[in-house]
C-alpha cells in the first residue's frame, strides 16, 4: 500500500492552501470512522474553512487512516465515508480540492504518515501551492502541529 489521493477539483493556479486534518477536526472522531451514519461535521471548523476559502485558500484534507492497514475497513469503505465528508462540506459551502491519506499502520514506518511530510509532498506534486502562505489546521498538536512545524508552517489547533 502507498499514499493514496482522491482529487476532487484540479486547478492550475498557485494558491495558498489549508492542509486540514479530517477525523477530530472536520468531523467527530469515532473509532476508525467509516460508516456514514457516524458522520457528524463540526460547525466551527466549517466556519474556519469558509473563512480561509473566502480569502482565496485551497482546501486539502490530509489524514492518517490506519484502520485500512489494520483491516478494520476497506479502501472502498474509506472512500465512501470520505466522499460523504466532502459532499457534506460542499453542501455547507466548503469546496475540498483533494484528500491525501496514509492507509498504513503506525508500526509500518512509512514516509506518508503524519507528522511526516509525505502527504504534503504528494499534494505539492499534484497542485501548485504557495507553500509560504499556507497553513495546517488540526486537533492534535503532537500530529498536526508537528506536521506544521516540520513544514515551517503556521498551525491552527481546533478543539471541540
UniProtKB/Swiss-Prot annotation:
Binding site for Zn(2+): 102, 104, 110, 112
Subcellular location, principal: cytoplasm
Residues flagged as site, Contributes to substrate recognition: 113
Entry-linked Pfam families: PNK3P
Catalytic activity: D-glycero-D-manno-heptose 1,7-bisphosphate + H2O = D-glycero-D-manno-heptose 1-phosphate + phosphate
Domain of life: Archaea
SUPFAM superfamilies per the UniProt record, alphabetical: HAD-like (SSF56784)
Disulphide linkage map: none
Assembly and oligomerization: Monomer.
Subcellular location: Cytoplasm
Gene name tied to this protein: gmhB
GO-annotated biological processes: carbohydrate metabolic process
Active-site residue numbers: 21 (nucleophile), 23 (proton donor)
Name used for this protein in its record: Probable D-glycero-D-manno-heptose-1,7-bisphosphate 7-phosphatase
EC numbers for this chain: 3.1.3.-
Required co-factors: Mg(2+); Zn(2+)
Residues annotated to bind substrate: 21-23, 29-32, 63-66, 113-114
Binding positions for Mg(2+) per the UniProt entry: 21, 23, 139
GO cellular component: cytoplasm
Gene Ontology molecular function: any one: D-glycero-beta-D-manno-heptose 1,7-bisphosphate 7-phosphatase activity
Family as reported in the entry's similarity comment: Belongs to the GmhB family.
Organism: Thermoplasma acidophilum (strain ATCC 25905 / DSM 1728 / JCM 9062 / NBRC 15155 / AMRC-C165)
Amino acid at each position: 500500500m502507498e499514499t493514496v489521493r482522491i482529487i476532487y477539483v484540479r486547478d492550475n493556479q498557485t494558491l495558498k492552501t489549508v492542509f486540514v486534518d479530517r477525523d477530530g477536526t472536520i468531523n467527530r472522531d469515532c473509532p476508525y470512522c467509516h460508516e456514514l451514519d457516524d458522520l457528524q461535521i463540526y460547525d466551527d471548523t466549517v466556519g474556519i474553512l469558509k473563512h480561509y476559502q473566502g480569502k482565496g485558500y485551497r482546501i486539502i484534507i490530509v489524514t492518517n487512516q490506519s484502520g485500512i492497514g489494520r483491516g478494520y475497513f476497506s479502501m472502498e469503505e474509506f472512500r465512501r465515508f470520505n466522499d460523504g465528508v466532502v459532499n457534506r462540506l460542499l453542501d455547507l459551502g466548503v469546496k475540498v480540492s483533494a484528500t491525501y491519506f496514509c492507509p498504513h499502520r503506525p508500526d509500518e514506518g512509512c514516509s506518508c504518515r503524519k507528522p511526516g511530510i509525505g502527504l504534503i509532498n504528494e499534494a505539492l506534486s499534484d497542485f501548485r501551492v504557495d507553500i509560504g502562505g499556507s497553513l495546517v489546521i488540526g486537533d492534535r498538536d503532537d500530529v498536526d502541529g508537528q506536521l506544521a512545524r516540520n513544514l515551517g508552517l503556521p498551525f491552527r489547533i481546533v478543539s471541540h
